[in-house]
Amino acid sequence: MKVTPDTPGRDDPGPGRRIGLDVGTVRIGVAASDRDARLAMPVETVPRETGMKGPDRGDIDRLIDIITEYDAVEVVVGLPRDLQGNGSASVKQAREIAFRIRRRLTATGREIPVRLGDERLTTVVATQALRASGINERDGRKVIDQAAAVEILQTWLDGRATALNTLPETPHTDEKGNFPR
C-alpha cells in the first residue's frame, strides 16, 4: 500500500527548532534542529515503552519533555517506506506515536504540528556513516537511532528550505542558492 509523507514547507509554522523522531520497536531516536531550522543534530535515544494499545508510557512523557525543552515549533516523525513508496509494517507504529504526541501536546494547549516525514534509507545511511567513523553496528545501536533521526530531520529541513526558497547563501552562490554562471 502506498503511503505519502507530509510535504516540508506546507503550512510551515515559521522559524524555530524542529524535533525529528525515528520510531523503532525497541528505541526512538531523537534529533533537533538549530533555531534557524537549517541543521539537524542528535539528541538522545529513548527506550520504547508505549505499545499500540494501552496508555502512554514513559517514552511519550520523555518525548513531550524534549519537545518542550527545545521549544519546538514542529515535530517530524519518520514514515517508513520502501523505495517504491509502499508502507512497511512499521508505518502503524510511527503513526501511533505521532498521534499520541499530537494528542498530548493538544491536551496541554500547545498546537505544535506533528508531521510524517520521508524515512526511506535513513537507517542505511546512518549505519554507513557510523561504519565509516569506526563504530560497528552492535556497539552503535543507540547511536544509529539518533543518526537515523538526524537523517529524517535533515531531509525535512532541506525540503523545507527548498520549498520556502530559503537556501543559505554562501560566497559561491547567490541569494537563492544558485551557482553564478
Swiss-Prot record:
Belongs to the YqgF nuclease family. Pfam families: RuvX (PF03652). InterPro entries: RNaseH-like_sf, YqgF, YqgF/RNaseH-like_dom, YqgF/RNaseH-like_dom_sf. Its EC number is 3.1.-.-. The keyword Nuclease applies. Residues 1-20 are annotated as: Disordered. Gene3D superfamilies: YqgF/RNase H-like domain. GO terms for molecular function: nuclease activity. One of its GO terms (biological process) is rRNA 5'-end processing. Could be a nuclease involved in processing of the 5'-end of pre-16S rRNA. The lineage of its organism: Bacteria, Bacillati, Actinomycetota, Actinomycetes, Mycobacteriales. One of its GO terms (cellular component) is cytosol. Keywords: Cytoplasm, Hydrolase, Nuclease, Ribosome biogenesis. This is Putative pre-16S rRNA nuclease. It is found in: Cytoplasm.
